Amino acid sequence: MLVPPANFGIAEEGIYRCSKVETLNLSFLETLNLKTAIFIGGQEPSKFFKDFFTRSSIKWIVLRMSDFSAAAVPVKSSSVSNANLYSNNNSTLSLQEEKKKSTANGSQNSTTGDPVIQEELAYHLTDNDDLMLIKSTCLKRTFKTLLNVDNYNVLLVDKTALVIGILRKIQKWNIASIINEYRLFSGKNRNYFAETFLEIINIEIEQEKDNKTIVDNKAKKLPLENNRTHSIEYKANSGKLIRVNEDDLCREPEVPQRLLTLINQIETKVKNNKVLQVSGVLGDDLKKTSSDLGIFGHRYRLAFNKKENGDYGYYKARGKDNVKIRIPCDSELPDWFRFQRDLWEKENVPEEHHFYREHIFT
């Protein structure tokens, strides 16, 4: 009988999630073709599961409770209500103080809706903060494994149900959808501080550079450098044997027949267009097109490729003191992540290119 683990679900293609695993779920886990298992929130695999992982050649990673804040532990409903009252009282007091300061400053701080002022008043998380439920070191290690397609399929055993919420934050989900998914999988163990943490945290991504493209570029440069060295050596060795004849220098250079035919075709097209313009058959908009100008009518892009540099607006976050995580290079990322990133870039980030155009034969 196949029994899935508690709060089991498919987060993305190749990523499975649950809150805990038991021996009853072993037959179900065998059908998932797992390569990696990540245990988050203090739970460690039992000896029975360790034997199963070694027998199935599954790598497992355990993140200790020292990487988490004490506020990540599930609290009772009474403590949640007390926390709500305490936070509401603090928020009302802080709002009253801000109103007093704004009225005292007068017209200088009249623009309270300024995004710069809102950014200064925003709360910024650090590892020393109690609201930082998962430390940055834990997040870096988790997402470096979670977003590497070489580790798929991955089972994420997350007792806190926060890692997938942070993944949704990276995917630019709405905060309401993130909280709803968190409440759906956490159930009665949901935490007020966890919801606040998901709302406050900002993630900034740094992507590793693809070593394959660097190696390919070096491999392309090496034969060119070798050819240059060989040509230099050949010139140095054969420089004494070259004999120059003055009659050869006085001759005109020979032009290949193919270039002559191309020039004749371009000249005939230009003459025909002039005749059509005089007769009024050809409009003003079609006087000079890119096909008439040949290769010199095209524009050439000078912008660098984003895939090589990993410079995406999708990876950037607003505000200061962002939690920086490092993800694998583009070739090791899953297809669903690259698809969502490229789609978001296409819809939200306008492309900026610097073009130049050749004006020869125009």
Curated annotation (Swiss-Prot):
InterPro entries: Prot-tyrosine_phosphatase-like (IPR029021), Siw14-like (IPR004861). Disulfide bonds: none annotated. One of its GO terms (cellular component) is cytoplasm. It holds the Pfam family Y_phosphatase2. Disruption phenotype: Exhibits an absence of G1 checkpoint in response to linoleic acid hydroperoxide (LoaOOH) treatment. Rescues the temperature sensitivity of CDC13-1 mutant. Gene3D superfamilies: Protein tyrosine phosphatase superfamily (3.90.190.10). GO terms for molecular function: phosphatase activity. Required for replication of Brome mosaic virus (BMV). Present with 5370 molecules/cell in log phase SD medium. This is Protein OCA4. It comes from Saccharomyces cerevisiae (strain ATCC 204508 / S288c) (Baker's yeast).
